[in-house]
Structures are given as C-alpha cells and as structure tokens.
C-alpha cells in the first residue's frame, strides 16, 4: 500500500463528511452509539481508505458468529482466514457459538447490552433488524457501503433489486446480503424434479411432461423394485416447489419471505395457499398419496432416511438439487424433468426460482463497534473476486488450482468423503447463512455440480424472469406479521398435511379458508400489500 498519511487523511476526512448525518441518526443515545458515530465521522489514521492492507497496524475485531457443525472448530486455523488476516491486517475474534445455541445467545447479548461489534452469520430476523435498527442498536450501513465498500456497491449496481430488498421502510440498510449470481443457474434454480432414466427405459416410457404421464410413470416405478418408493423426499416442500408453476402459484418466486405472490386478476398480494391453484395441487398430490405413489411417511421421514432410500436405489422420483450429490453412483441415473403441465399443449412454467438476494440478517454492525470503518472494509473484501475466492475455495495451491481459466479443486479435496469434509480446513462458507457473493466461478457445492446445472438448464427456459426478494417492514409491522404469521403457518402446515394424507377431505376447503380468516389472514396479507406498494 503506497498511500501517504497525508493522502489517507484527506480521503478519509472527505468520506467522513458525507457519512456523518446517517451515522449519527443510526446510533442510539448511549455512549457506545456516540463512540461508533464518532469513529465513522473521524476515521483513525491507521486506516487505508482503499487497497490492502486495510490498516497499517493490526486491528482486532470482535464478532459473535454462528458455527455450523460442518465448519471447522477454529476458524482462525482455516487457510482462508489466515490468508485474509495476512492480506488485510485485520485480526478476528470470531466468537463462535454452536448453531443450535446461536439464536438464544444472540438474543441474550442484545437484551443485556453487552454485545460485540457485529453479529456474523447468525440469521437476525427481519423483525429484529427493524426493531434494533430503529432503536440505533444496529448501525445503518448506507454511507459505510457508499464510501468504504466498492465491491459490494458494484454488486448492488449490477442488480438494483438487491438494494431494494435490503432497504427498510426508514430508508436504511441494517445488514449485508448473501448474493447469488443470476448467471449461475444451479443457484437460481436449486430444486428440480427428477426421474430414473433406467426405470423409464424399462417401462418403455419417455420423460413425462404432463401430470397424467408423470402419474403413469410413478405407477410403473411402484413395481420397479421390491420396496420401491415412486416419489419420495425428506418432507414434501421440494415436491410442492416443483409443481408451483404447474398450478399457477408462487408467481413471484420462492424468496418473498412468506407464501405470497400476486393475484393474476387483481394484481394485489395474495396468500397463495388459500388459492384455487393450491387446492388443485393438493388434490393431485392426495391422489398420488392415496394410491401409494408418494412415500407414506413423508411427513415424518428425515433427510438421512431419504438419502438412504436413494442410495439403495429405491426412489423412482424426487425433488432436490442433484440426486448424484446425495445418492452416490445410483444418483447419476436420474434425469431432470421439464415443468409438468396439466394438459398436453399447455405452456410449461417454472416458479421455483430463488432471488439474487439469497439472505439478509447475516451481518449486522452494532453501536458497540469500535472499528466501524475497518469492519466495513473487511466485509467488503469478501464481496470482491479476491476475497470471494478465498471464502469459497481457500488458498490457491493449497486447495485449488487454476486450470484453463477455471478454479479446480485439488484431488485430495475433490475426492474427500464430501465437499464439506474436503474444504473444512480451507474455506469459510461451509454451513451456509453467509454474507457474500456466490458464483459458479468459485462456489463448489451440489447446487453447482454438473448434474444440477444440467437440470437447471432444462427448467430455465420456462422460469420466471423476475422474482421478489424478501420484504422488509417497520418494527411495528414486523411484530404484527410475526404474531399472525406464526399462527397462520402452524395451521397451514397441519391442514396441508391432513389434506395430502386424506385425514381431512378437500370438500372442507371452504371451512379451511374460513379458518384462515379467523386467524387473521386478511390483516396479514394487507401488511404485505403495504410493503409491496411501498417498494413498487
């Protein structure tokens, strides 16, 4: 870094003037908030405003971080973290907390007031972002992004919908995003519907394209092997997703934060599990279940049982990213299906589309932050190509190498028992819930495997072109939505399971809709309509 102290002071002072008003508004009335605002207004001369290292003399930042079981026990021993420290001069006290205890720990820290400089990968809910943002506990990041985060700014400029999804009704951004590259199809179209090619051939069938043809295939699959499961899963949600386009629901994608889309007639927000299309989907699925064509314990089965059945070659059809990623060699025999249509001649439609804004709430800066500018610059490092490669791949030469312009994992990593096992001591992304920029150039997972990508190419021509990111609300709105949403979701899950399994007849649909209204569905939808209008 060659910037002189004089140049560094001049640049930082100019940036501070532009940042001061929002920083003061963002921070609460306690001394911690005032100190953080002061540090944003008057950055330390130790900070380099651009380039690396971020600081001339090392600085330590303190976080609370959720640690998934799939990640390393000590992140400072991960190659990517060690290399990032060497390049940035930022040392990190990660404050690792096991994922099962992370939510409780975060809430206790916020209640006590004795919280760290930032919460990292803890999944702060939108309601808490609004609540603590409005209180000044969470720092508004708008001007820090504009002045000190050029990599993230570039991502936001490439896709304005990202900024829209991050911004709260008060105009502030309180968290940093997880971003999916829209050109990486396996990330945008994750769950696909699959059928066994060898079973299709044995039955003399081509890949089904209509609901009737799909049912006929499942009937053949039922007798393909002893113990065969025509259509299975670890839960039924993935199967639902693959049928949304067929039945004209979820027409704004699957990342809105709730089961809402636009009513095709009124063009207003609707709760689509209360729509006619959803009822028709349940009717189709109940018919499959009643005839033994859907795994009979699908509502109680877990992921381990699902993968075991797939590995044993018992599944005729499933909905996931890529069967080969879970079932081993037998998984390679599955082929992706085009979006099913109700009748021959109907136009296929694919609505299981993820937003580019894959998550919010996984990085928030608090008003106890002693190093706000340093922390903003450190986070921005991960949104550039240099940092993103470290985050997802590790250090070149240790875990991957460049081959014909593409990063390829080294054999000892690629041939490990799993991608998680191979990259655990090299990369930081394991366990998900990360603020960062995922693209097919450096993200290595089942979503970007060859089979997943081929499946995504099959559905992509029929996919929604624009989808909603999650909505943001005021603290007051969030409290209402959370209360109503918990009751609505709990009832909906129980009722849907009963309709599919036949414990409850779909003849009771009108009573079902009446129950939704009694719970408060009208107010729930109205809140989403307000949020939709606010950002339209």
Question: Where do the PLM segments sit?
Answer:
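Extracytoplasmic/secretory soluble proteins
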Residues: 2-7, 12-536
